[in-house]
Amino acid sequence: MNRDTICVQGGYTPGNGEPRQIPIIQSTTFKYATSEDMGKLFDLEADGYFYSRLQNPTCDMVAKKICELEGGTAAMLTSSGQAANFFALFNICEAGDHIVSSSTIYGGTFNLISVTMKKMGITATFVDPLCSEEELDAAFQPNTKVVFGETIANPALTVLDIEKFAKAAHAHGVPLIVDNTFPTPVNCRPFEWGADIVTHSTTKYMDGHGAVLGGAIVDSGKFDWMAHAEKFPGLCTPDESYHGITYAERFGKEGAFITKATAQLMRDFGSMQSPMNAYMLNLGLESLHVRMQRHCANGMAVAKFLEAHPKVAYVNYCGLESSPYHALAEKYLPNGSCGVVSFGLAGGREAASTCMKELKLAAIETHVAYARNCCLNPASSTHRQMNDEQLAAAGVPAELVRMSCGLESSEDLIADIAQALDKI
């Protein structure tokens, strides 16, 4: 089925006399006739619902739609994109393990990997996404368990060479996790290029209206955990909390990853998306394919204007022919990338601050990738926890402005930027 149709009708097919819109199952718990019936759920011997901290029918309908959009075999929703990335990584890694990650990633994810997970005994090596195959290979250690990157990095807007990173990961017997938030599956499906697991902050384009927080994890079902059983004891050895069940044996490579993340991590951490948020997310998904076209068109128009302006020192947008990532964008993002543009002004950080203050249509806010135009100085906000060396590696200089082009008229957006630049 075409992805446009999946956006509208995927995930839920009503029966005769059932609601056309997905139902909101706003209930914490679910009734069963016997203790034996419920016991089968707790032993993972039967499908069903018993507590919405782990699973909920509304959430599963929306997760199924996202799974269909990405071309995966199983999926789950989380309370945020940050929760999705943590679950995806921690579902594989434990104390003593190592992660290889692209250096140009969202500041919150960088902090998660480099600081928070370090406290759990998990270390990481960050690599330039444009590194050679030899440099990438050198980043691996005997205890490396996963490779991570973003299809389009926030806010540096670098493009991940998914095939290169997948090849390196698989050569070392580990999976590649790709955060596909910015392009969404409308513009890129990482599984088609070798990725094994995809994550999303559904708060961004998928919701598209700045209304609800959420995240998603999708499994391709292609990574053979049992073929590398010694690397992944959490998936390939008995889980004492479920009477010795071995996820990779019981659920196979198509279902082991999401089953473990749900039954174990969601049970213990409880970062579940609410049914109401899932319902509102689905409303956003129904128009995702249409909105992404406009976001991409506005992003390109703004990027071209900025590139030609004498007060602009540089522009990061992979759709521009001048971008060092243009060839990768043509390969992985032939239908467009996203509506986010980042740029630096010749006058440095002070000029950037003045420009943002003078904008009328672009509000200064931490959000990105939704219907309204907005902007941000990442070095003083989303990446504020980084030192100068880390900022440089992440592609986030002090003067960088991240602009998220909304669904407004591109002519109005450009006119607003022009008048702001005139004030510098």
Regions found by a protein language model. Name each.
Residues 7-13, 75-308:
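Conserved PLP-enzyme active-site core in the AAT-like
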Residues 1-56, 64, 404:
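N-terminal "arm"/small-domain region of PLP-dependent enzymes with the aminotransferase-like
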Residues 47, 73, 213, 277-281, ...:
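Short amphipathic alpha-helical segments
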Residues 292, 300, 304-307, 311-401, ...:
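Conserved C-terminal alpha-helix-loop-beta "cap" of PLP-dependent enzymes
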Residues 34-86, 108-116:
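Conserved N-terminal alpha-helix of the aminotransferase class I/II PLP-enzyme fold
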Residues 14-16, 206, 270, 331-333, ...:
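Short Gly/Pro-enriched turn/cap motifs at secondary-structure boundaries
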Residues 1, 114, 123-124, 138, ...:
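PLP-dependent enzyme catalytic core of the Aspartate aminotransferase-like
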Residues 29, 220-223, 345-348:
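Short loop segments at secondary-structure junctions
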